Amino acid sequence: MLTSGIILLAGSLLSPNPGLIFWTAITFVIVLLILKKIAWGPIIGALEEREKGIQSSIDRAHSAKEESEAILRKNRELLAKADAESDKIIREGKDYADKLRADITEKAQSEAKKMIATAKDEIEQEKRRALDVLRNEVADLAVKGAEKIIKTTLDADMQKKIVDSMIQDLSTKRN
């Protein structure tokens, strides 16, 4: 019996039954219509909503990327300008420092030359004064010596005493 039941089942599945095909097709169409009415709209709506969300995210990502690239370009330009400006400022600072150093050096050299000239003039004046004083002293001594010579008669001892006296006078006046 088992064998005959299996054969019956196998025979009915393998042989096309027009009623079964009809009812299967009707059931498929009904299920398809029910799914279309109940589930197809929400599924398609959810898929479209999801697609819009994804497209919106992609668009935002593209615009953010473009915006960040624009900001990056602008920052690079600003950085290049800042570098150029800093180089210019440094160059101007160095030029100013060089000019200032040259001016200060020139002024210092000029001042040193003036000080040297002033010192030379003062030394020359002091030298002249000293020579004038020395001449006056020598003249005074010569006059005094001549006075002494004239007042007394000169012998060898007397001459020696006069010269010694003049030397003493000269040394006491210097000190």
Swiss-Prot record:
Subunit comment for this entry? F-type ATPases have 2 components, F(1) - the catalytic core - and F(0) - the membrane proton channel. F(1) has five subunits: alpha(3), beta(3), gamma(1), delta(1), epsilon(1). F(0) has four main subunits: a(1), b(2) and c(10-14). The alpha and beta chains form an alternating ring which encloses part of the gamma chain. F(1) is attached to F(0) by a central stalk formed by the gamma and epsilon chains, while a peripheral stalk is formed by the delta and b chains.
Q: Where in the cell is it found?
A: Cell inner membrane
Q: Which stretches are transmembrane?
A: 20-40
Q: Mind listing the UniProt keywords for this protein, alphabetically? A: ATP synthesis, Cell inner membrane, Cell membrane, CF(0), Hydrogen ion transport, Ion transport, Membrane, Transmembrane, Transmembrane helix, Transport
Any one GO molecular-function label of the UniProt entry: proton-transporting ATP synthase activity, rotational mechanism
Transmembrane helix among keywords: yes
| Known function | F(1)F(0) ATP synthase produces ATP from ADP in the presence of a proton or sodium gradient. F-type ATPases consist of two structural domains, F(1) containing the extramembraneous catalytic core and F(0) containing the membrane proton channel, linked together by a central stalk and a peripheral stalk. During catalysis, ATP synthesis in the catalytic domain of F(1) is coupled via a rotary mechanism of the central stalk subunits to proton translocation. Component of the F(0) channel, it forms part of the peripheral stalk, linking F(1) to F(0).
Q: Can you quote a single GO CC term?
A: plasma membrane
The superkingdom listed in its UniProt entry is Bacteria
Which InterPro entries has this protein been placed in? ATP_synth_B-like_membr_sf, ATP_synth_b/b'su_bac/chlpt, ATP_synth_F0_bsu_bac, ATP_synthase_B_chain
Query: Can you name this protein?
Result: ATP synthase subunit b
Stated membrane topology is: Single-pass membrane protein
What's the source species' lineage? Bacteria, Pseudomonadati, Chlorobiota, Chlorobiia, Chlorobiales
